[in-house]
Structures are given as C-alpha cells and as structure tokens.
Regions:
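N-terminal low-complexity, intrinsically disordered "leader/linker" segments enriched in small/polar
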Residues: 1-72, 78, 267-270
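Short, hydrophobic/proline-enriched secondary-structure or compact coil segments at domain edges
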Residues: 47-59, 129, 167-168, 233-236
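The right-handed parallel beta-helix/beta-solenoid scaffold, focusing on the short coil/turn
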Residues: 51, 127, 211-213, 233, ...
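Extracellular glycan-interaction surfaces
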Residues: 41-42, 82-86, 91-135, 143-146, ...
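Extracellular low-complexity Ser/Thr/Asn/Gly-rich intrinsically disordered segments
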Residues: 1-29, 106, 155, 167-168, ...
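Extracellular glycan-interaction patches encoded by glycine-rich segments
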Residues: 190-192, 229-257
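Extracellular, beta-strand-rich glycan-interacting domains
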Residues: 3-5, 44-47, 52-59, 69, ...
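Early transmembrane alpha-helices of polytopic membrane proteins
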Residues: 37, 74-80, 89, 93, ...
Length: 278
C-alpha cells in the first residue's frame, strides 16, 4: 500500500484522506540495549539486519538462513518452503546483540530441530528450537567472563524430568536446571525443590549485583540460595552435563553483563506480552 493522500468527492465537497503509516518496529533491545548475548526466534532490535537461524534440511543437507518478517516474527513461510516435508535442523543460532557471539553446531546428530516432517516446532503458537529429538548439546565456548552485575533469562519448555537443562554455562552452571529439583544461578544452588521438574512453558530470569542474587519463575521470586560456590568454567550456550542431554524447547535467551535489576519488571512484561507465558 502506498502512503500519501487520496481525495474523494462527497456531496460536492472534496475530502482528503491521509493514509496512516504503520508504527515502527521496536524490539526489547531497543528498550534495554547493550546485551552481551541475545538469541531469539523473534527480532530483538530495529537496528539488527541479520537472520535468526541457519537451518539444514534433511533431504539433501542444504543450508539456508532464516530471517524475520517486518513485524519481527520469524519468517515461517521461508522456513517451510526451504525445508518442505522434511526435517529442519538448526546449525547456527545468530547472536542479535551485535557482538557476533553466534551459537554454532557442526555435528549433525547434535543439531536441534526447528521443523519436524514439514511442521514448525512451536510452544504456545510461537516457533521454538527443539532439543527433544537430538537430546544433546548446542553450544559455543568462551564468550566472556561474567561479572557480578548481570540480568539473564531464557524462555523455554522443559519437557522431561531427570535431564539437565543448562541454558548458559559449563562447570558450575551459570544458569540452568542441574537435576530434577535444583536450579543453578551463577554457580549457586538457587532454588532446590518445590517445583514441577517438567515446568512447561516458563520464563526463568536471574538478576545479580554485588549484594543480591535473585531468581524468578514467571515473575515470582523463587530465590533460596543453598550454596556459595562462585561461577567458574567456560561459557556455553545450551550445554549438557555428563551426556545426559537436553530435553525441551527454547525460544529466547539474553544476557546483560551489567546491572539491570531496576529494569526487571519492564523486561519481564515485554517477554510475556510476546510469548504469552503466564
């Protein structure tokens, strides 16, 4: 549709109508910039001109980048046109922070699904990277050494109890589920017991500053620190532990390596408005 003016004669009077321009796209990183790492199936910044994922199709192992629609949603039509009735595996999840920290997996059997037999994998109607089938790891190494100040979150669906789901970190898990009933944050047992180990569609968010560590599930404070071990080890994205593999689907994960504790509510609202988690 062209933008401009159009005239129409009504009862002898010329009336001019002005076409209304659509609102400009605004992503979460426009509102809360300077992320260290940012992965998502939605566009996160108006200034980001890259793609969301690189996908390998099972029919001939060809690969193609998959980007976004003007509204910021993943281009599902491009994805299904490329993959067809086959399976589509993620070989690269692009970092939208501008720091080039792309998560890459070159081993075919360890690549998670995004399309299964022609159907885009989803949670709550929104595309999701599916670790259920591969059940292994998808990572990059040594992005950065985390400082004390941090806001970190992921949007995921953990589907099988008893498997580690370490979204970020290796060694002492930076952020993720260590076992059936323990969530680790910054190398500490942040939350032990009292939650459903499969969890379903969940926003897990952690904040850290020099004096306080907090973890939230769906905007509810669940912090109960039991250990005091500091985080150590390399930085991985969606790691596994002792070959237990991952179990679930992931849609988004961002780290701000700075103090955004005051922005937690706004960040949570932005995420929940898009994904409809709680």
């Amino acid at each position: 549709m062209s933008l401009g003016n159009s005239a129409k004669n009504i009862g002898g009077f010329n009336t001019v109508y002005k076409a209304k321009a659509s609102a400009p796209f605004v992503g979460i990183l426009d509102l809360y910039p300077n992320a260290q790492i940012a992965f998502s199936v939605r566009k996160l910044s108006s200034s980001y001109t890259g793609n969301s994922l690189r996908v390998r199709r099972s029919s001939d192992n060809a690969e193609q980048d998959i980007g976004f629609l003007p509204n910021g949603n993943l281009d599902e039509a491009a994805l299904t046109t490329f993959v067809g009735a086959n399976n589509g595996f993620v070989t690269t999840w692009y970092d939208q922070s501008g720091n080039g920290n792309n998560a890459i997996q070159t081993t075919a059997i360890r690549q998670p699904l995004i399309v299964k037999i022609g159907t885009v994998q989803k949670v709550n109607g929104i595309p999701a990277v599916d670790y259920d089938s591969a059940g292994l790891l998808f990572h990059t190494y040594n992005f950065f050494i985390p400082t004390v100040d941090m806001l970190i979150y992921h949007v995921a669906e953990r589907t099988t109890a008893g498997k580690v789901y370490s979204i970020f970190g290796s060694g002492n898990t930076l952020f993720g589920y260590f076992s059936n009933n323990i969530l680790y944050f910054y190398g500490r047992e942040a939350w032990a017991g009292g939650f459903n180990t499969t969890l379903g569609h969940t926003l897990m968010l952690g904040t850290a500053n020099p004096t306080t560590y907090k973890v939230y599930q769906n905007n509810v404070d669940k912090t109960v620190f039991l250990s005091v071990a500091p985080y150590s080890g390399r930085f991985d994205f969606v790691n596994n532990y002792a070959s237990t593999g991952q179990s679930g689907k992931m849609q988004e994960g961002i780290i701000w390596n700075l103090n955004r504790t005051a922005d937690r509510t706004g960040i949570t609202d932005n995420i929940n408005t898009y994904y409809g988690i709680f």
